[in-house]
Amino acid sequence: PYYLESVVTDLKKSGLLRTYYRDKLRGYRLGVRAKNRLLDNWPERFAPYLTGDTDTNRLKSEIGRRLRLHRLAETYVTMDNAGVGLFQDEKPKVFAPQGYSDGAVKYPSFYSSREVKEMGVDTTQIRSSRFTGVLLTSGGIYVTYNSSAALMKWRYKSEMRVKALMWSVLCQQRLTGQYNADAVQGVILGESMELAY
């Protein structure tokens, strides 16, 4: 913890990271200098997240939306620690709006709910789902949720629509040779197993 605190302190002193407080909830945001440095050095990796009218550029002040971003960040860190591909330049563009036909997924890759929704009109039916993204491996499709420290508030119909969409798009259209109907499963991340009972 001490090392992490010193890194965050250094980033704040350098003007690369800003602390944001609201409703007794602390968060960190990239400063303009940090965004510019990322875009200058790795445009293919960070441009999809830091340019245009993206969710990451809009300030989230409502506590519910900020907590969702925290859960998504926890999910990203978990996937990164597991060696799963996160960035668009290191994984197949399975959910591209124009379709996908580049072959099987060979390495585990995580696609955020926002990346999935980039497919277009078909994804309007999953707007109210609680999923944070989809983990694709060579052998399965895992719709991923993160309850963090709270009990998950399930919307059964919404979650079944996500499963149906993954089955339709991946098993029947884009990756038909790789996945069958039983391939769509789920992964729930959380702070402890106590919330699962």
Please provide the spans of the model-predicted regions:
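Long, contiguous juxta-domain segments that are non-catalytic but functionally important
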Residues: 7, 16, 118-121
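Hydrophobic, Leu/Ile/Phe/Ala-enriched alpha-helical segments that form helix-helix packing faces
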Residues: 8-15, 75-83, 165-178
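Accessory beta->alpha helical hairpin/"wing" motif in late/C-terminal subdomains of nucleic-acid enzymes
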Residues: 8-11, 18-50
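A structural signal for short, well-ordered beta-strand segments and their strand-loop junctions
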Residues: 19, 29, 87-90, 187-189
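Exposed, interaction-prone assembly regions rather than primary DNA-binding/catalytic cores
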Residues: 53-150
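Catalytic cores of nucleic-acid endonucleases
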Residues: 124-132, 146-196
